[in-house]
């Protein structure tokens, strides 16, 4: 199938899907009955909210906004990594960034005498992901111009397993924090509040314009490193900027929702299938699709455990695992 060319279909369908699922997420599967009309009125200013409307404003709306921001950020990070490494299997989860950030968060939660929140957590997660990413790139030869793509993925999988092993040891040694860390490791937005929105929003608002401004250079990088260099792209600076943006995005997401997997791996392929290979289209479409997938996973997580709740990461794993196997077989 060729990429969608008509702008109404290219942009209209993903935007419409996101809006519809966002609206449904505000009132579906609620322990306290909430109607679609309640959800709509909750978004309108100038009146005293009823109990269902207050529930939407204080719980459901920040939860859905956090899901949108995290889905868009992880999809964008995955697209950038696949472009940067010329590897269709690259993602924050497979290259060890998620697990490194999660290990840093788990160690901080277990060892810190006082709770840490806000941008400090994002910074800690970004540092953990950055150290893990450097180790993967070094072990997998990712800093060489002619690196083995499979070697890079294998290094990422090995380091991810190592980090997750250390995280489990942390759980065993820090029994007082074990349940909270365990639930957080599953990846989800069930505990998201407005402070999480304000924690994520500046990172996303800062990163997205920079990435979109680099879209033309990323198009050249898609051809080959040598072609991009010949056409005037400063590869060292571009790689540094992209790596920093990826670490900021992933660190912020992991600090709020835990290590959510598969969005960064699958969504870039869906975006290229839908929008072609022009990064000016692929980058924003991947953000729309990532936000929609994360929201959908959160709604399904509520549906499967209603009136309880499941982490959205568990649903994404159920969806992503067979898709990952299909992707591996398709790539031969």
Curated annotation (Swiss-Prot):
GO biological process assignments: intracellular iron ion homeostasis; iron import into cell; siderophore-dependent iron import into cell
Record field: transmembrane: 8-28, 65-85, 101-121, 123-143, 152-172, 200-220, 245-265, 308-328
Keyword presence, Ribonucleoprotein: no
Stretches in topological domain Periplasmic: 29-64, 122, 173-199, 266-307
GO CC terms in record: ATP-binding cassette (ABC) transporter complex, substrate-binding subunit-containing; membrane; plasma membrane
Membrane topology: Multi-pass membrane protein
GO molecular function, one term: iron chelate transmembrane transporter activity
Cytoplasmic topology ranges: 1-7, 86-100, 144-151, 221-244, 329-332
Phenotypic consequence of residue 60 to C: Retains 33% of wild-type citrate-mediated Fe(3+) transport
InterPro entries for the chain: ABC_BtuC-like (IPR037294), ABC_transptr_permease_BtuC (IPR000522)
Subcellular location: Cell inner membrane
Main location: membrane
Keyword terms of this UniProt record: Cell inner membrane, Cell membrane, Ion transport, Iron, Iron transport, Membrane, Transmembrane, Transmembrane helix, Transport
Triggers of expression: Induced 1.8-fold by hydroxyurea.
Job description of the protein: Part of the ABC transporter complex FecBCDE involved in citrate-dependent Fe(3+) uptake. Probably responsible for the translocation of the substrate across the membrane.
Subunit structure: The complex is composed of two ATP-binding proteins (FecE), two transmembrane proteins (FecC and FecD) and a solute-binding protein (FecB). Interacts with FecB.
Name of the protein in its database record: Fe(3+) dicitrate transport system permease protein FecC
Species whose genome carries this gene: Escherichia coli (strain K12)
Taxonomic placement: Bacteria, Pseudomonadati, Pseudomonadota, Gammaproteobacteria, Enterobacterales
């Amino acid at each position: 199938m060729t990429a969608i060319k008509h702008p109404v279909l290219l942009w209209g369908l993903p935007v419409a899907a996101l809006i519809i699922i966002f609206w449904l997420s505000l009132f579906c599967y609620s322990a306290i009955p909430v109607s679609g009309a309640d959800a709509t009125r909750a978004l309108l200013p100038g009146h005293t909210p009823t109990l269902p409307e207050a529930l939407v404003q204080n719980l459901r709306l920040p939860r859905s906004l956090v899901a949108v921001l995290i889905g868009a950020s992880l999809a964008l990070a995955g697209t950038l990594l696949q472009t940067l490494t010329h590897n269709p299997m690259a993602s924050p989860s497979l290259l060890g960034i998620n697990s490194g950030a999660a290990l840093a968060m788990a160690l901080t939660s277990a060892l810190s005498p006082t709770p840490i929140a806000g941008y400090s957590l994002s910074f800690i997660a970004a540092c953990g992901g950055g150290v893990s990413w450097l180790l993967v790139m070094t072990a997998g030869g990712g800093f060489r111009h002619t690196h083995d793509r499979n070697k890079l993925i294998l290094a990422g999988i090995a380091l991810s397993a190592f980090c997750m092993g250390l995280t489990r040891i942390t759980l065993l040694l820090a029994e007082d924090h074990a349940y909270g860390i365990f639930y957080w490791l599953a990846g989800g937005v069930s505990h998201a509040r407005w402070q999480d929105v304000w924690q994520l929003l500046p990172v996303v608002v800062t990163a997205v314009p920079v990435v979109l401004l680099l879209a033309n250079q990323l198009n050249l990088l898609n051809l080959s490193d040598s072609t991009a260099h010949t056409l005037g792209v400063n590869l060292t600076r571009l790689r540094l900027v992209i790596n920093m943006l990826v670490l900021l995005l992933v660190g912020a997401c992991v600090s709020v929702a835990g290590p959510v997997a598969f969005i960064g791996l699958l969504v870039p392929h869906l975006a290229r299938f839908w929008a072609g290979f022009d990064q000016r289209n692929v980058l924003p479409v991947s953000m729309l699709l990532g936000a929609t997938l994360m929201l959908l996973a959160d709604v399904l997580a509520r549906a499967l455990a209603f009136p309880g709740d499941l982490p959205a990461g568990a649903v994404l794993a159920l969806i992503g695992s067979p898709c990952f196997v299909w992707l591996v077989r398709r790539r031969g």
